[in-house]
């Protein structure tokens, strides 16, 4: 567990650097989607969640579901760094026969969900919380959904289910980067007012800067104990931290190459070296 915020911020940069290396070497990967949720995932694994590295299926652990599963590459360096993958582990990202693909697989230690189509992970998370509550477990389930993912009807079915069943052990992080592949969400199909919509379905809601680890941690610590599920809307930018990719359209699913890749890696490396 990391207790110092500056150290945690530096860890975010370290994880981003390793994530970008994986995608650059593979020539593919959802870099921008991974980077918009990097601070959320890092704060979860290094500060917020309870788990046992040497016992990945410990019954009282907190669970994490990356519903916007194409961004799962950000979790691989974290699992490696924490020791879930064993000593001297190698992440063979996008290689034939490797479990480390653009979408997560449960066969990877520490991964709770084999991902695929959008809109599925939140329903899985709701089912987990429902089962945990039947067993009187206090374990929490954290899930990241994308704002573009909110165009899936199954997301709203899951939200309705969570509110109706008072799934208060559910914490949803909504990665509000306001972008899809080709346009901004509010141009394509308006999502706002998202906070009001979640509250109408019986959720507690908060809104934070999704690139501020301290705000993310404080939001989890301030969750009301009132029997309601929770949504933390995280305002983010796709590709945050890479000048050539941040908040840029048509960068979805694209790994930088050549000079752009070199500049991106240098940009992150400089922040790491400066302790940011």
Give the label of every model feature segment.
Residues 30, 70, 101-103, 211, ...:
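Histidine-centered active-site/metal-ligand motif
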Residues 1-15:
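N-terminal hydrophobic or amphipathic helices/low-complexity stretches enriched
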Residues 110, 114-224:
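Thiamine diphosphate
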Residues 213, 218-276:
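Glycine/aspartate-rich loop-and-adjacent alpha/beta segment that forms the canonical ThDP
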Residues 27-35:
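Structural motif
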């Amino acid at each position: 567990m990391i207790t110092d915020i500056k150290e945690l911020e530096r860890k975010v940069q370290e994880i981003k650097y390793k994530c970008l290396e994986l995608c650059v070497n593979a020539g593919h990967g959802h870099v921008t989607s991974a980077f918009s949720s990097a601070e959320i995932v890092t704060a979860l694994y290094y500060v917020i969640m309870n788990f046992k590295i040497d016992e990945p299926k410990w019954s009282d652990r907190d669970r994490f579901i990356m519903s916007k599963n194409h961004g799962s590459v950000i979790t691989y360096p974290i699992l490696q760094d924490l020791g879930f993958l064993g000593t001297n582990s190698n992440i063979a990202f996008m290689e034939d026969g490797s479990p480390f693909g653009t979408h997560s697989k449960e066969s990877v230690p520490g991964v709770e969900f084999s991902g695929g189509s959008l809109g599925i992970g939140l329903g899985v998370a709701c089912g987990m919380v429902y089962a945990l509550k039947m067993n009187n477990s206090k374990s929490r389930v954290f899930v990241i959904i994308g704002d573009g993912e909110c165009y899936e009807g199954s997301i709203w079915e899951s939200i309705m289910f969570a509110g109706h069943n008072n799934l208060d052990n559910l914490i949803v992080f909504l990665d509000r980067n306001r972008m899809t592949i080709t346009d901004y969400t509010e141009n394509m199909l308006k999502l706002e007012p998202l906070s009001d919509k979640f509250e109408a379905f019986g959720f507690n809601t908060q809104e934070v800067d999704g690139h501020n680890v301290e705000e993310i941690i404080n939001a989890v610590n301030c969750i009301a104990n009132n029997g309601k599920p929770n949504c933390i809307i995280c305002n983010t930018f796709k590709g945050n931290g890479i000048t050539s990719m941040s908040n840029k359209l048509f960068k979805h699913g694209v790994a930088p190459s050549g000079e752009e890749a070199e500049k991106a890696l240098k940009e992150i490396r400089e922040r790491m070296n400066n302790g940011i």
